[in-house]
Amino acid sequence: MINRIRVVTLLVMVLGVFALLQLISGSLFFSSLHHSQKSFVVSNQLREQQGELTSTWDLMLQTRINLSRSAVRMMMDSSNQQSNAKVELLDSARKTLAQAATHYKKFKSMAPLPEMVATSRNIDEKYKNYYTALTELIDYLDYGNTGAYFAQPTQGMQNAMGEAFAQYALSSEKLYRDIVTDNADDYRFAQWQLAVIALVVVLILLVAWYGIRRMLLTPLAKIIAHIREIAGGNLANTLTIDGRSEMGDLAQSVSHMQRSLTDTVTHVREGSDAIYAGTREIAAGNTDLSSRTEQQASALEETAASMEQLTATVKQNADNARQASQLAQSASDTAQHGGKVVDGVVKTMHEIADSSKKIADIISVIDGIAFQTNILALNAAVEAARAGEQGRGFAVVAGEVRNLASRSAQAAKEIKALIEDSVSRVDTGSVLVESAGETMNNIVNAVTRVTDIMGEIASASDEQSRGIDQVALAVSEMDRVTQQNASLVQESAAAAAALEEQASRLTQAVSAFRLAASPLTNKPQTPSRPASEQPPAQPRLRIAEQDPNWETF
């Protein structure tokens, strides 16, 4: 039955019981404290009332004594004159009576206890009578009326006041003793309460200890012992704890963990055997891969050498194409310069033709002038012939002028013929020069096209050279990476051998667990030769220890 109670429920019950006990003990303590506080208030009130009333009674007695002394002095004074002593005694009586009245007012200001109401009323009545009598006595003595003073029945009032005061004191004392008795009873009752509560607490502690031992400690000890067996490798025993408490849940969790651990150990045993076989195959495959990688590295090295030769040839072709392009550019510049010179010659020939035409025009003018001169000379000769002897000399001059004009005309004709021939030749030369200029322009255009083609050839050769350089660099990189692959394959072979050894150790370690079923027998493991014993490849190129291109490749 107790195993079905959960630990949390038990703890809540124990805490609830303790809380209830604490509440009960607190209530009892509060009640006792309240009663004690009430008793203390009552006692303090009784003490204050008793003190004020006692002071009132003492001061009233002192007033009566002072009045009696004053009356005696007045009787002893034969002249019945008020002396200083009488006046002082009367003043003292008035003061003490006033003080008594003050204390009695304080007494009346405090509400009387229910047990003291009747006594307080009796005292109040007797006080008023006695106070009035003392006031009258003071007046009598003040006026020197000793007869009235001695005739007043003050002593009876004083005795009545004294009896009332004594009754009040007895009632107050009785009430105080009752309070002390009640406090003593409350103290003994509190002791019994504490004893009972302590006994109940001890019983509850015993019950709680039994429940905790039965529900928590004993199952926990079994679980710890079972966990220690599991830690020692014994997975064959089973853990059984009845109940639906937290310990039962913990036992089920430990059993579930044991079953899971048993399955894990079984799978690890099977997996370690498979890993052992797989690592042997991996080691053999890595050895074969290492050999083929070395062969690939050799082939890549030869390819790299061929690419270097091809790179040198392409670079030479590119240099030749670049030189041819430069020569074609120079020829293009020369042809362009020649074309400019021919253009100048054509321009000059046109200018010469224009000048020849102008000279021909001038010669035509000269020819016209010679013709006019010849006509004028002829007219002059005719006029000289008409003049006869007087005009003979003038006729001779006219004849000479005519000869000169004829000769000038003949010379002008010859010069004109020569100039026309020269102009004709200049026109022919201009046509030829223009044809030569067009030919030079065609040559310049052809040379320019040749220059462009040679430039494109040179650029293409440069691109080919750079491409071949990149290919050669890639081949070299492939060669280097292949060398690295060879090293990595060797390391992988060594790692496979180490993994094989670790698998063997794992199998031996797992065999330490004892299962409920028939234990697995450890088959002998023959470790393969580690890859580190393989002859290392001799790299022909420098192999970098760390290279990010390995993943890219």
Swiss-Prot record:
Q: What is one GO cellular-component annotation here?
A: plasma membrane
Q: Which residue ranges does the entry give as Periplasmic-facing topology?
A: 34-190
Secretion signal span? none
For the Cytoplasmic compartment, the record's topological domain ranges are 1-6, 212-553
Specify residue ranges for compositional bias: Polar residues.
Answer: 519-531
| PROSITE patterns attached to this UniProt entry | CHEMOTAXIS_TRANSDUC_1, CHEMOTAXIS_TRANSDUC_2, HAMP
Function comment: Receptor for the attractant L-aspartate and related amino and dicarboxylic acids. Tar also mediates taxis to the attractant maltose via an interaction with the periplasmic maltose binding protein. Tar mediates taxis away from the repellents cobalt and nickel.
Name of the protein described by the UniProt record = Methyl-accepting chemotaxis protein II
Q: Which organism is it from?
A: Escherichia coli (strain K12)
Give the encoding gene's name: tar
